[in-house]
Curated annotation (Swiss-Prot):
Residues 600-615 have a biased composition (Low complexity). Belongs to the heat shock protein 70 family. This is Chaperone protein DnaK. Residues 618-632 have a biased composition (Basic and acidic residues). The modification Phosphothreonine is found at T198. InterPro entries: ATPase_NBD (IPR043129), Chaperone_DnaK (IPR012725), Heat_shock_70_CS (IPR018181), HSP70_C_sf (IPR029048), HSP70_peptide-bd_sf (IPR029047), Hsp_70_fam (IPR013126). Residues 600-632 are annotated as: Disordered.
Length: 632
């Protein structure tokens, strides 16, 4: 088995790590960063940008720059109304009812897994550049509170990126692995994970290399983006008061506000106030307008207090579900960039009555944990066992629209549970099995993961047929369901895929598209490198002509100038092979100058040697004369 990389596919940033010599190593990307912005953009030429280069052009290309796509993963369109308001790009309803992004620069509707696959490809390439070998397998992390559809969407993204996803691991669990890899003592830890778009709290029991999740809770609509949004709304209100101009419909201004809000939030983690200066934010009949504002930490904390408080109830529920008291918890580990906010650290201290542990890097711990899990799967990391749980209850709809639970939340996975049901009407020959996930009593109030029909049931009075429904949750938290008629032995099975998710055909098409993009990216890189070499050669040759043009024949000089012109003409087009051949021709022609430069250098060296010899002779003669003078 080859190397299995660990990827933290984050809302704001992503990170990749690998096990080397028994230790996890975070891999730097091509720009030298240990984390990569989870941002994908398409330029007006249709070129795809990923990571920091995509982030750099966000302000000028807001509608074609996709960030926080994780908030839309595995979600139906009607579930993302609040998220749509937070982004400048266009989110539409897909054919399957899922949320999709319409990218005008390429005139294409793309699914969230397809967009996330671009970030995963960047992580894959980062690891390959470091290892010097092809990478095909990965462990990818997801928020603990992700439902089945969101987990499946993450696996789909991996597949589109050319990765065999060996395991989906919950982010808090991965962070606990990073924290506990060298711990030998038995202890109970809470992992408080507040990232860019999601919040998770998990309680784990650690001891003898066993990492057992006791409970998990969270909110997949809460993260650092929401804190940024509060600052943005405040700045829009204040600017409107001062200038009577509403910036809320100006997408370019909103993008600048987004950047400024994120920067101010980060500054306020270490300073008492942050200055926000955005010159030329807009203009009216009187000329350009500038935004200048000083945001204090006190004001910021007042604005986001409702968000901070929203993390409290999930924590209390997780403690309760684990059958513990806050005082039973030995350590509270902070994960995710948003845990640097002082108000967050303060509420964590209030909930758990202790100072949180800041010993793990909140930006890298999850990727490190994913790499450790990869090491466990390959056998490189020994004596470690991970026991995770399903975050939400699973069941089916039964008579009266009730949800009958087969697997309760916080059940250790993998797991399998079965229950026998019967028909609701006389002579019923088929049953529609509607698979649900959630905690509400009524089926309509929970999420429908999928449904299938078991038919061919012999006609009989209601209550007579015996139908066994089995739920099987694998180690990735992905659900498989089967229904079997005990009388006939007829069975129907499905692996639950979100009713709004991607079909196998769509995934295969997206894999082909991703491969085509990889080929396009390779060609683009080759084109850029070829043009760079050509331009560099033109510059050097023109410079040499100025210095040595008078030392070569007029025929040679004219030939070189013609080759420079031919290469410049080739650079006006996009034919890489033509640029290469014209570069080669100019290289050959310019050897005449190189010969003259070499001869000139030799002559200069010879003259210097002669001069030194002469200088040596003269100095001896002078010495003699001085001594002679002294004798007089």
């Amino acid at each position: 088995m080859g190397k299995i990389i660990g990827i933290d596919l984050g809302t704001t940033n992503s990170c990749v790590a690998i096990m080397e010599h028994g230790k996890p190593v975070v891999i730097q990307n091509s720009e030298g960063g240990r984390t990569t912005p989870s941002i994908v953009a398409y330029t007006n030429k249709g070129e795809r940008l990923v990571g920091q280069v995509a982030k750099n052009q966000m302000v000028t290309n807001p509608e074609n720059t996709i960030y926080s796509i994780k908030r839309f993963m595995g979600r139906r369109f009607e579930e993302v109304a609040s998220e749509i308001k937070m982004v400048p790009y266009k989110v539409e309803k897909g054919q399957n009812g899922d949320a999709r992004v319409n990218i005008s620069n390429i005139k294409k509707q793309m699914s969230p897994p397809e967009i996330s696959a671009a970030t995963l490809t960047k992580m894959k390439e980062t690891a390959e550049a470091y290892l010097g070998e092809t990478v095909t397998e990965a462990v990818i992390t997801v928020p603990a509170y992700f439902n089945d559809a969101q987990r499946q969407a993450t696996k789909d993204a991996g597949k589109i990126a050319g990765l065999d996803v060996k395991r989906i691991v919950n982010e808090p669990t991965a962070a606990a692995l990073a924290y506990g890899i060298e711990k030998k003592n038995e202890e109970i830890v809470a992992v408080y994970d507040l990232g860019g778009g999601t919040f998770d709290i998990s309680i784990l029991e650690l001891g003898d290399g066993v990492f057992e999740v006791k409970s998990t809770n969270g909110d997949t609509h809460l993260g650092g983006d929401n804190f940024d949004d509060e600052i943005i709304k405040h700045l829009i209100t204040e600017f409107k008061k001062d200038s009577a101009i509403d910036l809320s419909n100006d997408k370019m201004a909103l993008q600048r506000l987004k950047e400024a809000a994120e920067k101010a939030k980060i500054e306020l983690s270490s300073a008492q106030e942050a200055s926000i200066n955005l010159p030329f934010i807009t203009a009216d009949a009187n000329g350009p307008k500038h935004l200048q504002y000083t945001l204090t930490r006190a004001k910021f904390e007042q604005m986001v207090d409702h968000l901070v408080q929203k993390t409290k109830e999930p924590c209390l529920n997780a403690i309760k579900d684990a059958g513990l008291k806050a005082s039973d918890i030995n350590e509270v580990i902070l994960v995710g960039g948003s845990t640097r906010i002082p108000a967050i650290q303060k509420i964590v201290k209030e909930i758990f009555a202790q100072e949180p542990n800041k010993g793990v890097n909140p930006d890298e711990a999850v990727a490190i944990g994913a790499a450790i899990q990869g090491g466990i799967l390959t056998g490189e990391t020994k004596d470690m066992v991970l026991l995770d749980v399903t975050p939400l209850s699973l069941g089916i709809e039964t008579l009266g629209g009730v949800m009958t639970k087969l697997i309760e939340r916080n059940t250790t996975i993998p797991t399998k549970k079965s229950q026998v049901f019967s028909t609701a009407a006389d002579n019923q020959t088929s049953v529609d099995i509607k698979v649900l996930q959630g905690e509400r009593e009524m089926a309509s109030q929970n999420r429908v993961l999928g449904n299938f029909i078991l038919d061919g049931i012999p006609a009989a009075p209601r209550g007579v047929p015996q139908i066994e429904v089995s739920f099987d949750i694998d180690a990735n938290g992905i659900v498989h369901v089967s229904a079997k008629d005990m009388g006939t032995g007829k069975e129907q099975k499905i692996r639950i895929e979100s009713s709004s998710g991607l079909s196998e055909e769509e995934i295969e098409r997206m894999v082909r598209d991703a491969e085509a993009h990889a080929e396009e990216d390779k060609k683009l890189k080759e084109s850029i490198e070829t043009k760079n070499i050509a331009n560099s050669l033109i510059y050097q040759t023109e410079k040499s002509l100025k210095e040595y043009g008078d030392k070569i024949t007029s025929e040679d000089k004219e030939a070189i100038e013609n080759k420079i012109k031919e290469l410049k003409d080739a650079l006006e087009g996009s034919d890489v092979s033509s640029i290469k051949s014209k570069t080669e021709e100019l290289q050959q022609a310019s050897y005449k100058i190189a010969e003259m430069m070499y001869k000139d250098a030799q002559a200069s060296s010879s003259n210097q040697d002669n001069a030194q010899n002469n200088a040596g002779s003269e100095s001896k003669e002078a010495d003699y004369e001085v001594v002679d003078e002294d004798k007089k």
